[in-house]
Every structure is written in structure tokens, then in C-alpha cells.
């Protein structure tokens, strides 16, 4: 049976039937005995969750086997390792691992927990179904034969069952909703077998117990973990562990007990301090189961971790201590695990994924726990247990493990995600973290970066370095570092729960409790502390120490990137953090919230951030400044910075480009021309607009000089050019008639400026008029008469009244002068451009244009068109002229002969 795996997905009803049959056949024992299930359950869990029907969940509770069976593919891979793990901690851990794995496998992690250990199972069943509990107890007892846990589970199972029963009930309720559990149950035949008896009995209630297990698992699991812890030699008998677990979930006292126990760190988080694994179990049911089952942090753990990263990861178990932290991260059994957390991707999933909600990952959440194990974590926790905050975090998430369970939040993933979910759970966590509901537990931080944070921190922390180191170690982890890492995720989340994240990172390793502490700062600090000092001392001082820790972590963690980012970010948080415990719930969120903005600002304001991040301490002190900036507004801060750098800069460039030119032009005023430092627009205006104005002025000046502005108007000029000679003649005649009137009336006339004030139109008439008017002097004489007569009239009017004697002489002189002026122009009159001449010119021009231009060019048509039009007009004109000439010469009587113009 051990080697046989089911890949078939069964409905709830089918599973119920199967569980009954399995129970009858005693498959439960075989399933429990099999060492592959735990590992495969991990991997299978993920597969089962989505694929398996929720129905199996009940069986899972009773029989983790079904969940296990659903994970056959993974099981084979991990069988050897799992078996080893099982062999190591198989006695009772085996059961726990199976259960735990199934727990991860089955959505209902609680069920996994039930399976986890006889104790856990009884608890689950006890809470959900007494009958199944008995059958399970029997099965567990059988298993107990190999596992020392047996005794503890039985007593513990019952006691735990009673105290945890409520939790189980609650958890089952949560869990039932999640189909993850059922998927797990179909996972493996072994689990089914094992779970069949226990699960079969609790078949109906199985689902509920399973879900109960979510929380219960947390608690039960812790118990299981404790059981395994006992086997591991954590120093807590299964019973004690269970008691601790019960206590943990029940109250902060549990964390204290846990702290006392030493594994307590995790327990505090996980409720079961007994073993980090246990904590993990509590924290991340899966992990715990793994831990329990891998009681041995040995290879099995790694295997488990691999196959059931979620499970084994949480189990972290990998080496109870180190492993745990590492396990949580399990990413790589060893450091990897820590690092893996980073890696987690799969695992991280668990770790981070947990956040990610990789259902399994929950245990990742345990990730916190993961390094719960790390004693350091424990120390941190121990203080934390004391530390109300820690405890609170725990209480707040007393179960948080269970809270994490809270996984319940996500029944399956539940634990995993839930852990992170803690949002739901967070409450507890939130308590600590209220600030950031999620962040609270490191989850938030993690959540923010599902993976990185948690994983990173926890991991980077290097597996174990103890957590502390890991925390730092990592600068990866540096939770803060993580921010560095992925400042984006981290930052954002970090921002939201930067502290948390850092915390998570450090804290994670340090202890779940810290994460759970839910004080983002606390966690951060815890993490820091953990990193800096094994957490014990720092952790206790959640607030102040944390602040310090935070500072140190910042410096230590390598806020380098984070420094700038987190430096500010964190600083803002740090401030809240500095405020200590209080800000846990309140300020962290602000800090985080600001942090995100800050983050952006930080990025943009890398320089400023670099200043602040000088060191943890620096960041701490700076954080106030930074915080104020953030407070004023992260964006605002960046805006201010931009305004300082950009604003001034922009003005400067503008001043250089625009202001200088305008200033010179303005100052130069009239001397603008001399100013060459002008912009193109100005130059354009100067050369074109000003020039036009000047031209107008010049024209006006010329008009004034001519003293005939009215006559100079263009309309008059146009009239002149288009007027016929007859009209011009009539005007001249009118002028003549006016002259006598002036003479007769001797009306004062305007003072004669020039002897011949002729208008431009008149001048044109004179020079361009055709010969038809008569003698060449005709126009000139008219002009002369018109020009001279006003003067005469004036003279007469002004004089005695008698015309001056010199008038005839004056007229003669004027006439001579005009003749002399016109004589040389006589020939010019013949050259005056008449329409005939213009037509000839145009024809010539058209010919030249057509011959010299490229007729194949795109615009050649324009030239040809103009030439043709002009030529045609000229031809028509010439024809007309010819017709007229003929008529005038022949004077034929028939008018029809002359073509009409």
C-alpha cells in the first residue's frame, strides 16, 4: 500500500465510501506507516487542492491518507526522503507528518493536523467526532508503536481535543468552504488508508474536523509537533507540547509556555513552542506536520521539504532548529531553506507563497515559524512570549499559528495563505500589527511580497544562521534588505508593512512570534534583533529594542538598497517603530503607507535616501526627518525634491534661454537691433515685423514729403492706371475751369508749396498718356496750366487785384521748362508699355519660361498653364488691334465687318 498511489480524483461521496472501506481494511495504519505520504502530501497538496473534490476533506481529517493519495505523483519522488523522515520521526512524527502533509495536502489543514499525530487526530476528531477519534486513536496507537508520540498524542489528543476542540470546530467551519482539503484527501491511498479509519469514522464530520483542523491543526499540530518535538527531544513530552499548543491557542500563556519550553519561539507563534517544527505546525499546519513527521531534521526533512515544501518547509522541521528556520524556508533544506525562502518560490511560496497563498505555503507562513525554531527565534520569542506584544501577536494570533491557521482564512491554503492571510487572522496578528492588518504578522510584510519578504527575510537569514543571522544574513532577508531586494514588492509592502517585512524577514527567523507579534515594527525590530542579537534580548523589548533592532537591521540588514528605499521608508516606519509598541498597530500602517509613497520618493530621491540610510542608526534618526517628509506626503516630498532640483533648474535654463533674450531686448528697447542675443522668435519679429513697420513709416514720410498724402493713396493710383484717357482729360478740363473760377473769385488758395505740385497719378498720366490726345505738349501744357494757374490766382488774390505783369513770362518759362523736361522723354512715350507691348513681353516671357524650365518636373504644369493663358490673351489682343487698324484704314461701311471687341 505504501508504494501505491492514487492519482484519481474522487468526489466527496466516493471518498466517504472509500474511507469507510479503507477503515474496514485498516488502511489507515498502512497509510500512517508509509513514509512517502508526508513528502508527497506536500507537493500533492498543491495539486490536490485545485484538483481534488472538497468532499475528501472530511476523510482527510479522519484520514489524511486520502489527501495523501491525491498527491501520488509527488509522493513517489519524495517517498525515499519521506520515508527517511518518517523513519526518523516516523514513530509519531510519521503520523504527524502524514497528517501535516495531508493537512497541507488537504485544504483542510486541520485534517492534516488530525492525521498529523494520533494526538492531533484525536483532537480534531474529538472536536468534530468522538467516534472517529477513538478509531483514530487506535490507528494512532498502532502508529505510536513506532512513534514515541503515541502516549503523548493519546493524552494530549484528548486534552488538546477538548481545548482545541473549539478551535477545531471553528476551523472546520472555515475549512469546509475550502475544497483544498478534499483534493488532498484523494491525494494518496496511504493517507486514505490511514485517514480512512480515523477519517472514515469521522467521514461525515471529517470535513468539519478537517477544517477545524485548520485552526485545530494549528493547535493540534502544535501538539503533534510537540509530540514530534518530544521525540526530537525538544524537551517537551507530547503531552506537554500539546498542552502548550492548547495553551498557545487558548492564550498568550501558551506562547509563554512555549517560550519556557525553548521551542517556544515557534510555539509562541505556533502556540506550540515545543518545537519550531511544532510551531510551524501550528503556524503552518503543513510545515508542522512535516516537522512532526520529520521529527528528524534530517534528510527526510529535506525530502519532505522538497516534495512538500509547504509541509516540510513549514516543518522547517528540517532541522528542528536550524531547519526550522531553514525548513520554513525549506527552500533548501539547509540554507536554501532559508535562502529558498527566497527561492521559495515554490517554497517560498510556502514561505512567501504562503503569502502567495500557495495553499501549502502556509507553512511557509510558518516560515515565520520556520525560523521559529531557530532557537534564536525561540529566544526572541521567549522574550516575546513575555513581551505582550509578542504574546499579543501570538495571542492576537495566539494561534496565529492557528491564526495563521487562520490559515483557516483559507482553509486550505488557509494555513499557508491564511498565515499570511492573517489578514483575516491578522486580527491577532493585526493586534500586533493592527497597523497593517496584513502586515501584522510578518505575513503582511510577506504578503506584500508574498515571497520575498517572508522568504527572503526568513531565508536570507540563512537557514539558520540562526534566524538572526539569517535575518541579516540575508540581507536578502534583510527584510529590509528584501525591500532592497524587491524594493518594489517589498517596498510597497514594505511600505505598507515595511517594518513587518523587515520584521518578517528578521523576525521570521527570529520567530514567528515576532512576525505574529504583528507589530510591524516589532517584527521588524524583532527581526533586527533576531538578526542582530539572537532576538532574545531585542525581541523582548519589542518597542524600543525593536526600534534599535530596526535601526541595526537597517544598517545591518543592508538596507543599502533598502536604506535608501527602506531607510526612508523604514524610517518613517521606524519612527512609528521608534514610538515602539504603540505604533505597532497604529503607526506602522502610517509608516508603511507613507513608506510606499516614500518609496517612490526614495527612488526618485536616491540621494536624500542615501543620506538617511547611512546606517541603521542614521536611518533611525533620519527616519524622523524622512517621516516628516513622508508625513507631509511621500509624493510631496518627492515633489519638493523635484522642485528644488528641477524647479530651480528649469528656471535657470529658462532664464538662460528666454529671460536673457527678453531682458536684453527689453532693456535694449530701441537698440534691439544691436542686440544679437535674441531668440528666433524675437529675431523673426525684428527682421520682419519691425521692418514692415519701418517701411510703412518710410512710406508715410515720403508721402509727407510729397505733401500729397491723400493723392498718394493706393486707390487713387489704381484709378489712375485703370482710368481711360478721356476721364483723365475731363479731369484736366475741370481743373482748367476751376482756375478761372479761382481767378474770378480771387478766393484764397492754399499756399503754393512747389511751383508744380502734381500728384503721382497726374505724373503718370503725363508720361504714359498715349499720343491720341494730340500734340506731345498737350498733356504737359495742361499740367503746366493747372499747376501754374493756382499760383497766379493766389498772386492775384493776394496782390492789388491786378494780374502781375510777369505772369506771361512765368508761363513761358514754365512751358519751356516742361518742354525741356518732356522733350527728352518724347521718345520714351513711344516706349511706354501699352497693352500691345505687354502682350509681346508676356509672349516672350512665356516662350522663355517654357524653353528653360523642365517640363517633366512635377510643377511644370504651372509654368505651361501660365504661359498658355498669357499667350492666348496676347494673341486675342493682337487680333483686335489688327481688326481696328483695318477698320480705321478701310473705313468700310459695313459695321459688321469689324469684329466686336
UniProtKB/Swiss-Prot annotation:
One of its GO terms (cellular component) is nucleus. Residues 100-112, 267-276, 347-379, 387-418, 426-457, 465-484 have a biased composition (Polar residues). Residues 29-511, 564-671, 731-752 are annotated as: Disordered. It comes from the Eukaryota. It is found in: Cytoplasm; Nucleus. Regulates the expression of selective PPARGC1A/B and ESRRA/B/G target genes with roles in glucose and lipid metabolism, energy transfer, contractile function, muscle mitochondrial biogenesis and oxidative capacity. Required for the efficient induction of MT-CO2, MT-CO3, COX4I1, TFB1M, TFB2M, POLRMT and SIRT3 by PPARGC1A. Positively regulates the PPARGC1A/ESRRG-induced expression of CKMT2, TNNI3 and SLC2A4 and negatively regulates the PPARGC1A/ESRRG-induced expression of PDK4. Keywords: Cytoplasm, Nucleus, Transcription, Transcription regulation. Residues 157-178, 608-624 have a biased composition (Low complexity). Disulfide bonds: none annotated. GO terms for biological process: regulation of DNA-templated transcription; response to muscle activity. The keyword Cytoplasm applies. It comes from Bos taurus (Bovine). This is PGC-1 and ERR-induced regulator in muscle protein 1.
Amino acid at each position: 500500500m505504501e508504494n501505491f498511489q492514487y492519482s484519481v480524483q474522487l468526489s466527496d461521496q466516493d471518498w466517504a465510501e472509500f474511507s469507510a472501506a479503507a477503515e474496514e481494511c485498516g488502511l489507515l495504519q498502512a497509510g500512517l506507516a508509509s513514509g512517502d505520504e508526508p513528502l508527497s502530501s506536500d507537493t500533492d497538496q498543491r495539486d490536490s487542492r485545485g484538483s481534488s473534490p472538497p468532499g475528501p476533506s472530511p476523510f482527510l481529517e479522519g484520514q489524511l491518507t486520502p489527501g495523501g493519495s491525491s498527491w501520488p505523483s509527488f509522493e513517489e519522488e519524495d517517498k525515499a526522503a519521506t520515508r527517511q523522515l518518517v523513519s526518523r520521526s516516523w514513530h509519531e512524527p510519521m503520523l504527524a507528518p502524514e497528517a501535516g502533509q495531508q493537512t497541507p495536502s488537504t485544504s483542510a489543514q486541520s485534517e492534516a493536523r488530525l492525521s498529523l499525530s494520533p494526538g492531533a487526530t484525536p483532537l480534531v476528531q474529538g472536536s468534530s467526532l468522538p467516534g472517529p477519534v477513538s478509531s483514530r486513536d487506535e490507528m494512532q496507537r498502532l502508529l505510536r508503536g513506532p512513534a514515541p508520540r503515541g502516549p503523548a498524542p493519546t493524552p494530549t489528543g484528548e486534552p488538546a481535543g477538548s481545548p482545541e476542540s473549539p478551535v477545531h470546530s471553528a476551523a472546520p467551519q472555515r475549512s469546509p468552504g475550502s475544497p483544498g482539503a478534499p483534493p488532498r484527501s484523494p491525494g494518496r491511498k496511504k493517507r486514505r488508508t490511514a485517514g480512512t479509519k480515523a477519517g472514515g469514522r469521522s467521514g461525515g464530520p471529517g470535513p468539519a474536523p478537517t477544517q477545524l483542523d485548520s485552526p485545530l491543526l494549528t493547535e493540534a499540530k502544535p501538539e503533534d509537533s510537540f509530540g514530534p518535538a518530544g521525540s526530537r527531544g525538544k524537551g517537551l513530552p507530547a503531552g506537554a507540547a500539546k498542552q502548550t499548543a492548547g495553551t498557545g491557542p487558548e492564550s498568550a500563556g501558551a506562547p509563554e509556555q512555549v517560550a519556557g519550553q525553548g521551542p517556544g519561539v515557534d510555539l509562541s507563534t505556533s502556540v506550540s513552542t515545543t518545537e519550531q517544527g511544532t510551531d510551524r505546525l501550528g503556524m503552518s499546519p503543513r510545515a508542522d506536520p512535516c516537522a512532526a513527521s520529520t521529527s528528524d531534521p534530517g534528510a527526510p526533512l529535506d525530502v519532505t521539504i522538497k516534495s512538500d515544501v509547504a509541509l516540510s518547509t513549514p516543518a522547517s522541521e528540517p532541522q528542528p532548529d536550524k531547519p526550522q528556520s531553514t525548513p520554513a524556508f525549506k527552500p533548501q533544506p539547509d540554507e536554501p531553506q532559508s535562502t529558498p525562502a527566497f527561492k521559495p518560490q515554490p517554497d517560498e511560496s510556502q514561505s512567501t507563497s504562503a503569502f502567495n497563498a500557495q495553499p501549502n505555503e502556509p507553512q511557509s507562513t510558518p516560515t515565520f515559524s520556520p525560523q521559529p525554531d531557530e532557537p534564536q527565534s525561540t529566544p526572541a520569542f521567549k522574550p516575546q512570549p513575555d513581551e505582550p506584544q509578542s504574546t499579543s501577536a501570538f495571542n492576537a494570533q495566539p494561534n496565529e499559528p492557528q491564526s495563521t491557521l487562520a490559515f483557516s482564512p483559507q482553509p486550505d491554503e488557509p494555513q499557508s495563505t491564511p498565515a499570511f492571510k492573517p489578514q483575516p487572522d491578522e486580527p491577532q496578528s493585526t493586534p500586533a500589527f493592527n497597523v497593517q492588518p496584513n502586515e501584522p504578522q510578518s505575513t503582511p510584510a510577506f504578503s506584500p511580497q508574498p515571497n520575498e519578504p517572508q522568504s527572503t527575510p526568513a531565508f536570507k537569514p540563512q537557514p539558520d544562521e540562526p534566524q538572526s543571522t539569517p535575518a541579516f544574513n540575508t540581507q536578502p532577508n534583510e527584510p529590509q534588505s528584501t525591500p532592497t531586494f524587491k524594493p518594489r514588492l517589498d517596498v510597497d509592502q514594505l511600505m505598507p508593512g515595511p517594518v513587518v517585512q523587515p520584521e518578517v524577514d528578521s523576525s521570521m527567523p527570529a520567530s514567528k512570534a515576532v512576525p505574529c507579534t504583528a507589530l510591524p515594527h516589532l517584527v521588524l525590530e524583532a527581526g533586527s534583533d533576531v538578526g542582530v542579537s539572537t532576538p532574545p534580548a531585542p525581541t523582548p523589548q519589542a518597542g524600543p529594542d525593536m526600534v534599535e533592532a530596526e535601526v541595526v537591521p537597517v544598517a545591518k540588514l543592508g538596507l543599502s538598497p533598502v536604506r535608501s528605499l527602506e531607510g526612508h521608508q523604514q524610517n518613517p516606519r521606524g519612527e512609528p517603530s521608534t514610538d515602539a509598541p504603540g505604533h505597532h498597530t497604529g503607526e506602522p500602517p502610517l509608516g508603511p503607507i507613507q513608506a510606499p509613497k516614500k518609496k517612490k520618493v526614495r527612488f526618485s530621491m536616491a540621494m536624500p535616501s542615501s543620506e538617511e540610510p547611512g546606517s541603521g542608526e542614521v536611518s533611525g534618526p533620519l527616519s524622523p526627518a524622512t517621516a516628516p517628509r513622508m508625513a507631509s506626503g511621500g509624493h510631496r516630498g518627492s515633489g519638493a525634491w523635484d522642485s528644488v532640483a528641477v524647479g530651480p533648474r528649469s528656471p535657470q535654463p529658462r532664464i538662460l534661454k528666454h529671460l536673457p533674450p527678453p531682458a536684453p531686448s527689453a532693456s535694449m528697447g530701441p537698440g534691439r537691433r544691436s542686440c544679437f542675443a535674441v531668440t528666433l522668435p524675437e529675431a523673426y519679429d525684428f527682421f520682419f515685423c519691425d521692418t514692415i513697420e519701418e517701411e510703412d513709416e518710410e512710406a508715410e514720410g515720403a508721402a509727407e514729403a510729397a505733401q500729397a498724402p491723400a493723392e498718394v493713396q493706393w486707390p487713387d493710383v489704381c484709378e489712375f492706371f485703370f482710368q481711360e484717357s478721356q476721364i483723365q482729360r475731363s479731369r484736366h478740363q475741370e481743373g482748367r475751369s476751376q482756375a478761372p473760377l479761382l481767378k474770378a473769385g480771387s478766393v484764397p488758395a492754399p499756399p503754393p508749396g512747389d511751383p508744380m505740385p502734381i500728384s503721382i497719378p497726374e505724373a503718370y498720366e503725363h508720361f504714359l498718356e498715349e499720343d491720341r490726345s494730340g500734340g506731345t505738349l498737350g498733356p504737359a501744357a495742361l499740367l503746366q496750366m493747372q499747376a501754374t494757374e493756382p499760383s497766379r490766382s493766389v498772386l492775384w488774390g493776394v496782390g492789388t487785384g491786378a494780374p502781375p505783369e510777369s505772369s506771361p513770362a512765368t508761363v513761358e518759362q514754365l512751358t519751356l521748362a516742361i518742354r525741356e523736361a518732356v522733350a527728352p522723354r518724347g521718345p520714351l512715350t513711344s516706349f511706354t508699355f501699352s497693352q500691345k507691348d505687354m502682350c509681346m513681353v508676356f509672349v516672350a516671357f512665356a516662350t522663355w519660361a517654357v524653353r528653360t524650365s523642365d517640363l517633366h518636373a512635377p510643377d511644370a504644369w504651372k509654368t505651361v498653364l501660365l504661359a498658355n493663358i498669357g499667350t492666348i490673351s496676347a494673341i486675342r489682343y493682337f487680333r483686335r488691334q489688327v481688326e481696328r487698324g483695318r477698320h480705321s484704314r478701310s473705313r468700310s461701311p459695313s459695321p459688321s465687318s469689324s469684329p466686336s471687341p
